[in-house]
């Protein structure tokens, strides 16, 4: 089959960095879906882009569609014929396919290859649709225009008198199939082979020869259109500039992503500021450079900041002027930060603790000061339940009292990302215990699902109390997430709480529902009249169970997560134990005996589903039942205290039990209606099924 490369370039006014990143992520799927709908085979799809252009190159695109020959499901026979004659439904179906009625047939729906989702049993009218593949060139113009209009942006705009929308006004279009132009019109612009280079270094229009020369032609025009190449070039120059200063740049993926999406040919200029500003906390200086300026900070081998920064610019012309302006802005921003720092130290925690009373956490849940009071009480309860030592408990309460104070500081008001960090700095300056100061900073951890947890008990206690308070309060007043909307980040808070409970060593024995009930007591005066603590615990538990399922699934597999969650109603109560069971189960899930265990688990629950679980015994001379008794007793003994005996030991024991039970099921009539011992046998097997569930629901391991 003949193939050619395809190029589409959309030139636009400057796109924000987030628009570029989002479009580059979406383009390959958009193109792949459109080509699949057109029955056009293709090779690799490459999304390229800068602030001034979005492009896609498709390798090895077929020049001709594949032929179509498919079976098409029509209306049910009962709707297609009446009194042996075709109805309008049958005629419409034939017209849709473009075939005469006598070329349609009636078949059993179960034998069809083109079944519909949720198709009901019965006989259906079917036909075949055939179509010769057409030339790709005749189809691509419209398809590419549709792709242009489907690119998602956080905010799209219209301009002029047109109806098309895009992230920014479109300036030019290039569409080439091989070396030949594709006729494409989008947003009132007709495509050609004329592209544009760097706005300042190569502003003249030039012709693109083909998709295969596109990247190199733009490179010569001072545009690195491949984002990966642009990023590597940029960071190579950043690294070289930092080394020239005798240091290294402070790693920051946000700055890498942001600057790579803000430039077409990135260059680095080195700026500096007064060394006196280095008296400010390291995090403040980095925040100033990082925030509006998007500069990289530089540090020496001892991780001490140097009085320099590295700015990414889109042109290397006249660097002295660029540095002069950048230095002036950096100095002004650092001067403001120094003023905030000195003023904050004058007033300190007593004043902030009063001011947070004027900051609303949520109109239905009170102020931040009220939230802090709840965190303090809940921290005391967690410290008690976790049985930490007296010093840790004392420091946890002290940290809880101060954990949100810096929200009222001038510095955090200007740099919200420094919440907690400034609290630590001010606490140390005020002579607070280092453990308390660190907890003020670390109680915000983990921020994301994969971020580090607080390392010490003090911070972990306050972090858990904060998350549980937020979860309980929002659910108690009816602010649970709906669909994809989660304005109060309850999913993130829940995941953080579950990770703390499952990964922090002193929290393994804490029960999730106990914490929710302890937190709920502080909201009784705010809760809706028709909501009690049991309803709140139930709603939060259902919500948290799904989050726990996801956490377990990420570490093991979806099947293992389903098996562990379904196996025990208490999985959520002690997430650490659930995680341990899942990890042990994952180690053996691929072994041959697991399939036997899955089948046995399913049959056990099937034959005994209506029987009450009872650990019966039988006469020793009753060979059939005594064998079952022995196996169930083995199951019971190996799973009764899994924390002591170990899950892996129980699984090792269960391997033999599963095989023997499988044999018994194959050789014995378990539910014998003529055997007077059948009811007791079923109750015993029901008990065996409950023993299996102590580990997991093996029937879920499909």
Locate each region found by the language model.
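Amphipathic alpha-helical "coupling" segments that flank catalytic cores
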Residues: 1-702
């Amino acid at each position: 089959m003949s193939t050619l490369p395809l190029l589409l370039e959309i030139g636009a006014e400057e796109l924000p960095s987030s628009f570029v990143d989002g479009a580059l992520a979406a383009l390959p799927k958009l193109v792949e879906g459109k080509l699949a709908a057109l029955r056009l085979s293709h090779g690799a799809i490459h999304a390229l882009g800068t602030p001034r252009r979005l492009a896609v190159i498709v390798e090895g695109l077929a020049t001709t569609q594949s032929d179509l020959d498919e079976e098409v499901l029509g209306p049910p026979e009962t709707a297609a014929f009446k009194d042996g004659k075709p109805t309008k439904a049958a005629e419409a179906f034939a017209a849709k396919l473009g075939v005469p009625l006598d070329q349609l047939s009636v078949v059993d729906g179960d034998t069809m290859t083109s079944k519909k989702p949720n198709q009901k049993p019965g006989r259906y009218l079917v036909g075949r649709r055939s179509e010769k593949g057409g030339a790709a060139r005749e189809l691509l113009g419209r398809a590419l225009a549709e792709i242009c209009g489907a690119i998602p942006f956080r905010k799209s705009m219209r301009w002029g008198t047109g109806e098309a929308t895009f992230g920014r006004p479109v300036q030019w279009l290039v569409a080439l199939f091989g070396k030949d132009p594709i006729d494409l019109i989008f947003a009132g612009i007709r495509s050609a082979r004329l592209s544009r280079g760097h706005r300042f270094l190569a502003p003249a229009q030039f012709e693109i020869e083909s998709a295969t020369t596109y990247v190199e032609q733009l490179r010569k025009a001072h545009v690195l259109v491949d984002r990966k190449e642009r990023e590597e070039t940029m960071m190579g120059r950043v690294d070289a500039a930092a080394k020239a200063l005798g240091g290294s740049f402070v790693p920051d993926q946000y700055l890498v992503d942001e600057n790579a999406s803000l430039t077409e040919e990135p260059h680095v200029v080195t700026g500096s500021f007064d060394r006196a500003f280095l008296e400010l906390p390291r995090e403040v200086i980095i925040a100033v450079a990082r925030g509006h300026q998007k500069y990289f900070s530089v540090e020496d081998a001892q991780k001490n900041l140097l009085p320099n920064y590295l700015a990414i610019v889109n042109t290397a012309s006249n660097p002295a002027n660029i540095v002069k302006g950048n230095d002036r802005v950096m100095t002004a921003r650092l001067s403001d930060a120094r003023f905030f720092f000195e003023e904050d130290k004058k007033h300190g925690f007593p004043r902030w603790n009063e001011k947070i009373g004027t900051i609303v956490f949520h109109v239905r849940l009170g102020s931040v000061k009220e939230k802090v009071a709840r965190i303090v009480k809940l921290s005391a309860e967690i410290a008690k339940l976790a049985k930490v030592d007296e010093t840790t408990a004392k420091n946890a309460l002290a940290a809880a009292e101060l954990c949100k104070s810096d929200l009222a500081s001038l510095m955090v008001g200007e740099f919200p990302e420094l919440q907690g960090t400034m609290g630590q700095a001010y606490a140390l300056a005020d002579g607070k215990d280092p453990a308390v100061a660190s907890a003020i900073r670390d109680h915000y951890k983990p921020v994301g699902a994969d971020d580090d947890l607080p390392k010490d008990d003090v911070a972990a206690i306050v972090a858990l109390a904060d998350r549980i308070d937020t979860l309980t309060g929002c659910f108690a007043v009816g602010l649970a997430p709906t669909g994809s909307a989660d304005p109060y980040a309850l999913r993130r808070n829940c995941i953080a709480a579950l990770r703390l409970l499952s990964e922090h060593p002193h929290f393994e024995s804490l029960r999730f529902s106990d914490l929710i009930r302890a937190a709920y007591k502080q909201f009784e005066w705010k809760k809706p009249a028709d909501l009690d603590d049991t309803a709140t615990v139930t709603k939060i538990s259902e919500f948290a169970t799904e989050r726990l399922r996801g956490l377990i699934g990420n570490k093991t597999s979806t099947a293992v997560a389903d098996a562990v969650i379904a196996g025990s109603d208490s999985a959520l109560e002690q997430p650490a134990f659930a995680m341990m069971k899942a990890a042990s189960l994952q180690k053996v899930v691929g072994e041959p005996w697991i399939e036997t265990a899955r089948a046995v688990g399913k049959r056990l629950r099937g034959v005994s589903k209506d029987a009450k679980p009872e650990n019966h015994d039988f006469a020793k001379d009753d060979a059939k039942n005594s064998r079952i008794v022995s196996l169930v007793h083995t199951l019971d003994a190996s799973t009764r205290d899994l924390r002591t005996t170990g899950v892996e030991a129980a699984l090792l024991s269960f391997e033999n039990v599963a095989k023997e039970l499988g044999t018994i099921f194959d050789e014995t009539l378990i539910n014998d209606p003529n055997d007077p011992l059948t009811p007791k046998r079923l109750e015993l097997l029901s008990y065996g099924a409950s023993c299996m569930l102590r580990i997991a629901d093996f029937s879920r391991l499909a």
